[in-house]
Amino acid sequence: MFPVIFSANFFELHTLWVFFAIALIVATIALIRLSLANGLKVQFISSNAWKIIFWGLIGARIWSIINNYSSYFSEINFSNFLRLFYFWDKGLELWGAIIAATIYFYLLCKKNEQNFWKWLDVLVPSTIIGLAIGGIGTFFDGTNYGTPSSLPWAVNFDNSAIKFSVPIHPTQIYTFLYSSIIFTALLFIGQNPKVKQMEKSGLVGLIGIASFCFLHFLEEFVRGDDALTIFDIRIPQIAAFIATMGALIVIYRRFRKKRSRLHSK
């Protein structure tokens, strides 16, 4: 569509990176406001932000390398080895970033005696609105595209990197739409007095994870870009299913116990 905003000599300004920067700014603003509203110290995040981002990037890169191993390991040589560290080639994967950043943040909370579940309630909505904006960036960049479609809103991309020359599902816009809806819904849920009173809640964050991952699982059925598969099932789809079920199980176990205590009283 419109992958490069500006190009001159040895410099190119990619639309994707511009929207990623906007997504980071908006997500940060949302995080600060939600943290203050929930009585959490923003300093904990600000003092560890670059560490969280660093491990997120490492995870995103590792997942991308695994997902596109044939591109990096077609030949074993020093040039291909250096390519493993080319973070600027847009070889970053969402699931790797989420998994690595979440694991690191959980360990960080334990080390600093922070309430992981309360932080989850503000981090998940903030991340989801960032992903919504990032979806617009991938649309202009022509990545994360869909399969051929005859639906009225199907889009024909003029991009040599896309393997289809016919109209395809604008899956990036799907991501933007359902992420925006989930973010809005989570804000309303978080304002519910009963949810606010829950000790060590985590309910908002877990609902956000379950709903986003479930809709991403459905999106994977119409994704047309290349991805590593197991038994012809895309690994990102498997990851989305596991994350959905994991979040639902945690919701059931945590909040069933809370209801049982209330009834026993």
Please give the residue ranges for each predicted region.
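A feature for loop-to-transmembrane-helix boundaries and adjacent hydrophobic helices
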Residues: 1-265
